[in-house]
Amino acid sequence: MGKIYASLKSIASYIPPTCISNVDFEKTLDTNDEWITKRTGIKTRYFALPSQQTSDLAYEAGKKAIERAGIEPKDIDAVIVATLSPDYLTMPSTACITSFKLGIENKAAFDISAACSGFVYLLSLAKSFIESGTYKQILIIGAEKTSSVLDFSDRSTCVLFGDGAGACVIGSTNDEKAAILGVNVSANGRYQDFLCTPRVHATFGATQAQEKQSFIQMKGNETFKVAVKTLVSEVKEILNTHHINPQDVSFFIPHQANLRIINAVGENLNFTPEQIVVSIQKYGNTSAASIPMAMNDLYEEKKLKYGDLMLLDALGGGLTWGSALVHFGGTN
């Protein structure tokens, strides 16, 4: 029997129903479409309904990913969700709720907290679980209802984010050309205040000022500088480790945080425009969901084929960051 590799078998996403354009923000904020587009590359984003929770978004993406993998919910051994906007503050995990909604019971389910790097962290965990023989089929989901943690009076943050979910089934293969080749993850708490919610949760009777501490806060300029330098270094490292040249990568799929960061990293690494996948103009920054949502766009546009090599990278609150080299092991 040959070596067992972890393999990305399917990809799916869920986009919430409410589309919010930059023009919509002009009605309530001192901002405009030109200002937002120039600084971020974002034109629209989608927000969940008030009645929808993060687990609802995760469920929709997860259900489709399972179907596309050609398996049943009962075949899933573990459900892992990455999110910064869970259904409950501390417990139960969004993964537990999502797995129940999917009809997956008496299997492992837990959340991870790595902010915008969450999906890369999910891949690292899933790869280890599969290749160690611990599990055979894992459902990983990046899901966010960032609209629940945004201060809609703060134009520096609320225009940046969107809601959504992306899911993958990770299984096994003997074919290295369908394998998750490698995943690197790292973090440095030195930068913890660059992206944060200073107060985890406002207690009952909290003042308005205390409530605002429950929303996302960001030091944009500082984050930009660290992001470009860190991501370029991270991508170079994983390419060198696996002896892969940039031109051998089918698609470079970065976390969709800011178009200026995406372009700066892509240009520094000499990727062509055809290699770089950009979806931020449609969805905004969907945190842990952004990479699988961008990947799903490729899939649904029939551009993603068996064996295609994807290079992923992300940086998020923590600060956390990571990169991955992933062959697509599914069918399209």
Swiss-Prot record:
One of its GO terms (molecular function) is beta-ketoacyl-acyl-carrier-protein synthase III activity. CDD domains: KAS_III (cd00830). It catalyses: malonyl-[ACP] + acetyl-CoA + H(+) = 3-oxobutanoyl-[ACP] + CO2 + CoA. Keywords: Acyltransferase, Cytoplasm, Fatty acid biosynthesis, Fatty acid metabolism, Lipid biosynthesis, Lipid metabolism, Multifunctional enzyme, Transferase. Pathway: Lipid metabolism; fatty acid biosynthesis. One of its GO terms (cellular component) is cytoplasm. It is found in: Cytoplasm. Its EC number is 2.3.1.180. GO terms for biological process: fatty acid biosynthetic process; secondary metabolite biosynthetic process. It is an enzyme of class 2 (transferase). Homodimer. The last Arg residue of the ACP-binding site is essential for the weak association between ACP/AcpP and FabH. Catalyzes the condensation reaction of fatty acid synthesis by the addition to an acyl acceptor of two carbons from malonyl-ACP. Catalyzes the first condensation reaction which initiates fatty acid synthesis and may therefore play a role in governing the total rate of fatty acid production. Possesses both acetoacetyl-ACP synthase and acetyl transacylase activities. Its substrate specificity determines the biosynthesis of branched-chain and/or straight-chain of fatty acids. This is Beta-ketoacyl-[acyl-carrier-protein] synthase III. It comes from Helicobacter hepaticus (strain ATCC 51449 / 3B1). The gene is fabH.
